[in-house]
Amino acid sequence: MLFLLSPAKSLDYDTPPHVSTYTKPLFTRQSAELIDVLQTKTPQQISTLMKLSDALSGLNVARYQAWSPKFTAKNSKQAVLAFNGDVYGGLDAKTLSEQQLGWAQEHVCILSGLYGVLRPLDWMQPYRLEMGTALATGQGKNLYQFWGSQIADYLNQRAAAHTSPVIVNLASEEYFKAVDRKALKARVVSCVFEEFRAGKYKIISFMAKRARGLMVRYATEHKLLTVRKLEGFDAEGYRFDPAASQADRLVFRRRQAA
């Protein structure tokens, strides 16, 4: 069983990693191609393309210029420890043991506009490149056309090696769209997290993001290998709702945050 996550805009390269184990990203040739395109852009062009402030566009232009095909402990950090948004607050990878991170390495994939797919312990240099960015390359007008079926092909390869070839989609729509569903062979199961507000259950974005990270942590701590086991997820007050769920759409609800 493979768990898919989106990356985060917020990054933490200040906190030293608590583990030294790392792997190299798999799609560095493609990343270098994208960096070559990004390095031709001015801060104003990046600001317009990505809808960023002048300060953020300047920061990311500097990141593109500094990016190197050689990944080192000085310019990189393990992806799951570098990302720092709502999802990663729920996952809280800095408190996972090296053994638990090793399990996550085999069962978690982080989708990325620049890196395609990152494993948790893959070294990552800082960047900002949302998957929905309309960055024109030799492969087309946006990143979906750039990546094509490459991400799905890789996920097929990974899923086929598992006893349960299932992909648990915990990524956003923007990122999961980069997985070519026609090319993807594995069964896909999605998880939905809802809060009780004003008399009904609804998805609240930042809470749902945190819950996705909590789900991956739960799976990692319990070494879950089947969809049925996911139904036991109960972190921070969530409970599986069988009546609201379908075979490939698991709904978790809570009346109030625990």
From Swiss-Prot:
UniProt xrefs under InterPro entries: YaaA
SS bond partners: none
Q: Which GO terms describe its biological process?
A: response to hydroperoxide
Question: Which GO terms of the cellular component aspect does the record hold?
Answer: cytosol
Task: Report the family membership.
Answer: Belongs to the UPF0246 family.
Q: What is this protein called?
A: UPF0246 protein Bpro_3713
Q: What organism is recorded for this protein?
A: Polaromonas sp. (strain JS666 / ATCC BAA-500)
Q: What is the lineage of its organism?
A: Bacteria, Pseudomonadati, Pseudomonadota, Betaproteobacteria, Burkholderiales
